[in-house]
């Protein structure tokens, strides 16, 4: 979707350098998406429907939202966070409450880190027309949003430990996961 921008920002990569032709990339991507959809529906109807949603988020991010500042910074983390929901659907065919905590924590953390990664070359982004969150709302506010989201992610991650009996309801595996993070 952004071959012209990649040619400026990352000319050494396979697509902008023409080591990988656009038609071949489209074929590989299409086959990958089809295989993911088939695999998702083979696992369960709910998992298959979620794969459709994830494919839509992926395409929306790459085609439109990547250049829309905060919307790109929100859409990508939502898709990444939904992978935990996908895992629960595949394993249990339902989404336990703790998985929603994980989803929110992952999405918030990735939101904060996604904003942080957009600081690396603001001038180049401005030149090629990519509207990143720092360019949209300013560097200072973007730093505050990033730090707040990252901090909130850790707070959400430990909520089940605070609100439920530590080992009985939250589970030792969840407590270990939060401890590792």
Put a short name on every predicted segment:
Residues 1, 109-130:
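Membrane-embedded alpha-helices of multi-pass transport/permease systems
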Residues 3-51, 130-168:
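Multi-pass membrane catalytic core of lipid/isoprenoid biosynthesis enzymes
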Residues 16-95:
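Intramembrane alpha-helical segments
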Residues 51-52, 59-65, 164-181:
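Hydrophobic alpha-helical transmembrane segments and immediately flanking/interface helices
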Residues 97-110, 173-174:
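Alpha-helical transmembrane segments
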């Amino acid at each position: 979707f952004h071959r012209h921008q990649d040619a400026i920002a990352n000319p050494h990569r396979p697509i902008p350098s023409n080591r990988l032709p656009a038609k071949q990339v489209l074929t590989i991507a299409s086959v990958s998406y089809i295989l993911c959809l088939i695999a998702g529906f083979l696992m369960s109807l709910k998992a298959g429907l979620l794969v459709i949603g994830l494919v839509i988020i992926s395409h929306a991010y790459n085609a439109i939202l990547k250049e829309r500042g905060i919307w790109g910074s929100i859409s990508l983390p939502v898709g990444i966070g939904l992978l935990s929901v996908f895992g629960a659907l595949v394993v249990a065919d339902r989404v336990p409450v703790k998985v929603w905590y994980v989803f929110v924590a992952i999405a918030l953390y990735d939101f904060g880190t996604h904003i942080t990664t957009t600081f690396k070359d603001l001038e180049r982004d401005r030149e090629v027309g990519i509207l990143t969150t720092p360019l949209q709302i300013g560097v200072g506010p973007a730093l505050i949003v990033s730090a707040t989201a990252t901090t909130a992610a850790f707070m959400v991650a430990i909520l089940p430990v605070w609100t439920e009996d530590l080992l009985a309801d939250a589970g030792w595996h969840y407590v270990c996961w939060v401890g590792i993070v």
